Amino acid sequence: MFVTRLAGATLVLATLGGCTTVTSAQAPADIAIEGSRVHPESITSDGAGNIYVSSVGGTIYRALAGSRKAEPWIRPDAANGLTSLFGVLADDAHGVLWACNNPPFDGPAPAGATSGVKTFDLATGAFKASFDFPAGPAACNDIAVAADGTAFVTDTAGGRIFSLTPGASELALFAADPALVGIDGIAFSGDGTMYINNVRQHTVQRVDRNGAAYAGLTTLALSEPINGPDALRPVSGNRFLQAEGPGNRVTYVDIKGDNAVITAVKTGLDSSPGVTHVGRIGYATEGKINYLFDPALRDKDPGPFIIRAFLLP
């Protein structure tokens, strides 16, 4: 978005293909996003190294492995109902691309536009299904998937986490808590623990559970402040990549117990809501959101939109 232990069965985040390796001798190449006024949001990658990017206009862009251009791949149409996108997640294990869809925030909403999660075939881009959030304030933000195929979806405005089991026809409420208002990124560690961040509270938290039920949050003590945390993506073990939109940077988040060490790995970005990695190469989106909200910039040309590539330490 611009601007606690989970016990029981072991959960594995089906996301961010890290199977493709990149040697340190290779210079990371930025990727240009085709089009104007794209304003990308989330970014994800599959095991083959293909990269997928969401946008405020509802188009999903794809850059094939090794390409320096991301092209429109899934466009809004009457069948898929795409309007404006936040989180996207490549789920290799189940052959699904997940996408958080919302009514446009920079103009009137089309009739019937709702917040919810949509699924597409990861290989072909064919639309599969839509799962709308219940009525009320809502903003679908990001997704993580368990080893059994159950998806967990964050709702920033409503302070909720929904789940969707394989074969289900509608979302189930996993958690609702005033403390969850502002929830943004979601990811699992190597041992199946669920972590989230909160874009409004500037926190990283562990989700606690009593059996199958949500049991609250543990706010981690951070080694330094963070500013508007957004995407949260697993690397390995208890290490994550985190994008900070207002902070204009990407960091490592290394968790040990109730503490987390924050280490900057890429700075100087232009409002960076999304991050993924392919092997040792990180990729971050630049949303350039000032061109959406600043009256002095709204009619100005934001220039090209670039996915920034950088070597991970």
PLM regions with names:
Residues A111-D148:
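Asp-box/WD-like beta-propeller blade repeats and closely related beta-sheet repeat scaffolds
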Residues E34-N50, A79-N101, F133-A151, D177-M194, ...:
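Beta-rich, blade/repeat-based domains predominating
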Residues T276-P313:
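Blade-level signature of beta-propeller repeat domains, shared across WD40, Kelch, NHL, RCC1
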Residues L64-R68, D121-A126, T165-S169, D208-A213, ...:
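Short loop/turn segments that connect beta-strands within beta-propeller blades
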Residues T59-Y61, S115-K118, R160-S163, T203-Q205, ...:
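A short loop-to-beta-strand structural motif that recurs across blades of beta-propeller domains
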Residues I51-G57, D91, L97-G112, V145, ...:
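Conserved beta-strand positions in repeat-built beta-propeller and related beta-rich domains
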Residues A27-I33, K69-A79, A126-F133, E170-D177, ...:
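A short beta-strand motif characteristic of beta-propeller blades
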